Amino acid sequence: MTHSENQSPRWIAGIEPSSDLLSLSMTSIYEMECREQPQCLATLFDAYEGDPDIKGQLGNLERKSLSAGPILLVGMGASYCSCVAGASWLQSGARSAFAVDAGEWLHYSSTKDQAALSLIVTTSGESAELVELCRNPATGSLALLCNNRNSTCWSLVEDKLPILAGPEYGNATKTYTNASAACIILADHILGRAWSEDARRMLQSFSTTLDRVFAQRNEMEDFCRGAANIVVVGRGPAYGSAIMGALCIREMTGQRAAPHSGGGFRHGPILDVDQSHVAIIFALGRTAALGVSLAQDCVARGGRVILVEAEDRVPSERLLPIRLDPVPEPWESLTSILIPQALTLAIAERHGARLSPRFQYGEMKE
């Protein structure tokens, strides 16, 4: 359905923006929404810990997940990136789970009826592929994680959880972090694990890290200047933030950027590394040593590396270390995204943003 077929504007998240907000540039909106992330996460944690309806829904989905079959987290774009954190955490807890691209799943899967639980993750609730999946659900349990209570998906699905990020007019930032957090919380419920203490610890680190990393953004932009290509590399929960980070850089700035898993980059693309190449490598969690080794090999081939880790390291001409406070697994999927977010802002401030703010939902095409 197009905007012209509606009698009123389809405002993002169903909320009309203020006139002051409508006058802001994309770069200003993007920075504002990046800096709103800590408060949005706090709002989500408070609701998922204290709201009886949300707690009841989490318990309901936990029970439904006990059925035979894998758990599927289904999304597109930034929402797919959020799915990766939840699926990785479930797999680490010995529960079969997969992050699935909705467009691929819609057209090429004949096994969706075998899932114990399929969680549809969507910010808008209006993407054509996700709407179709909600209209024609599999025989297994279907649930929704969505940021728009006025959406088509929200009206079609009975079991649903809110993302609680508020309207988002720039590139996916706070919706990615909130949706990732919600996926992790649901995974913890399914695994029978407490989540609040680890989440609150991460949030404290996230807030201070955001300020520190964003203060370093010009240093990162200067380090990357002239790169023909930027790759973002992660493993486990941080693989989702690697995909999201590359999307953010490329969509907002036009700078060529691509994501890779650590193993995927090691076995092939590393052969292409030279002085025109920059890698942002997340050396975090249980596979941190593999990330450090990969960074050293990239530097040895003449490439430049922004190495994101929980240790202090001396910088060099081709190595820019960025230290993150250690957080409990799998919450590095949230803290690590701050580095590509900050770099994106610096590039946009220097060269301008390639996108315009989006205040209304447009035509949703496959």
Whereabouts are the PLM-identified features?
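Membrane-targeting and insertion segments and their boundary/processing signals
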Residues: 4-18, 64, 104, 156-160, ...
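Glycine-rich phosphate-binding loops that contact phosphosugars or nucleotide phosphates
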Residues: 66-203, 207-208, 235, 270-271, ...
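Short, functionally important structural connectors and interaction interfaces within domains
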Residues: 21, 26, 50, 145, ...
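Phosphate-moiety recognition in structured ligand-binding domains
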Residues: 2-30, 38-39, 43, 289, ...
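Short, positively charged patches
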Residues: 24, 28, 33-37, 55-58, ...
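Active-site phosphate/pyrophosphate-binding segments
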Residues: 32-69, 159-280, 288, 351-366
